Amino acid sequence: MTTALDQLKQYTTVVADTGDFQQLAQYKPQDATTNPSLILKAVQKDAYRPILEKTVRDHAGESVGFIIDRLLIAFGTEILKLIPGRVSTEVDARLSFDTQRSIDKGREIIKLYEAAGIGRERVLIKLASTWEGIRAAEVLQREGIRCNMTLLFSLVQAAACAEAGAQLISPFVGRIYDWYKKQKGAEWDEAKDGGANDPGVQSVRRIYTYYKQFGYATEVMGASFRTTSQITELAGCDLLTISPDLLQKLHDSAETVARKLSPDAAKDAQLERVAIDESSFRFQLNDDAMATEKLAEGIRLFSADAVKLEKMIDALR
């Protein structure tokens, strides 16, 4: 049986979105992504508790921030043993509005990986797609530090990231879907509003088309999926990062997966170029209620999970 996952891999680079690296081997992803919430979830499992305890023990007396950085690198290093490609490691979301500290943290993370014998070409630094985060990426990219721009919900964010030369963006499909579904309430009709009409799917399709039309090299990696249909509707996207439970569903399915996105088709589009100077960026983002709310919410959630992780570490010291 040719699985839906195998078919998807013909068109798209499949990435595993997890801190639970023991699940990686069975799905054979090219890359992997992590975030503070996924690492927090992983260290609460018995299988990964020793990594947390060893990291705390090895760096006793150091600050909690120092220990968290080493914990992220410990997970990233283990993940890279199991995949041929890259791992994404996230800068603390509490730095989302501080360009210089984001730059400093990105440099520090890369130095830690290089000290562990891992080349910077195998690491993507995840930054929130705020104006400040995008400016940090612009500097880091010039230094050969590749960036993955996360918490991305709008075309203006995507356009600004591409102009800054970011290596990759992660537009969030599922969180966009969540927002619109909540707005429509009882009027939401999955059969009519989902699938190809899913607002999250349409957002990624529009961003992908914009990039290919204007010849940007920045990679598009759809993220934050709720259903396999959201994934298959984006077959052909440069990359898709998928949680283990949805990877399993694709692995178990024999559904036919057809290519939905292609560079050639996108190049024939007639989208207008987006203005991305700072004032235009801030106005357009502010004018998009969904993107504004979801960006703020995402930063709050990742920041809260970073605090929870700090408390776990403090409890072990």
From Swiss-Prot:
Pathway involvement of the protein, from the record: Carbohydrate degradation; pentose phosphate pathway; D-glyceraldehyde 3-phosphate and beta-D-fructose 6-phosphate from D-ribose 5-phosphate and D-xylulose 5-phosphate (non-oxidative stage): step 2/3
Enzyme Commission numbers on file: 2.2.1.2
Alphabetic keyword roster: Cytoplasm, Pentose shunt, Schiff base, Transferase
Gene Ontology terms, MF aspect: transaldolase activity
Active-site residues, Swiss-Prot/TrEMBL: K126 (schiff-base intermediate with substrate)
One cellular-component annotation, GO: cytoplasm
HAMAP family, sorted: Transaldolase_1
Name of the protein in question: Transaldolase
Gene source species: Burkholderia thailandensis (strain ATCC 700388 / DSM 13276 / CCUG 48851 / CIP 106301 / E264)
